[in-house]
Amino acid sequence: NPHWVPELRPKTGQTPEVSTYVLSQDGVSETISNYSALLKKMSAGYLREGKKYITLAVGCTGGKHRSVAIAQELVNRVTKGKKLAGKSIVAQAVHRDLGREI
């Protein structure tokens, strides 16, 4: 948890230092790969049903470091040159809890 690393604590998961730290932890890459694969499978069904939006949530204790870095990496992996049913995938990360820390 970057919260316990003094030089990372004041930064967010949007900074390269925190993002690199979070994404290099054991199991994180596999978790993100599994999550993005699930999203791609779900998306096909959503399209068949005529739905245009999927909302995903990623959370952690403080909402400042881990969830921010992981959500942004999910956006990067899901949108990077990907198409679904011939349509480009558009994704965005909304970091609800950034700025709320005490």
Where are these regions (language model features)?
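Serine/threonine-rich low-complexity intrinsically disordered regions
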Residues: S24, A71, A85-G86
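Recognition helices and adjacent regulatory flanks at domain boundaries
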Residues: G50, K64, G86-S88
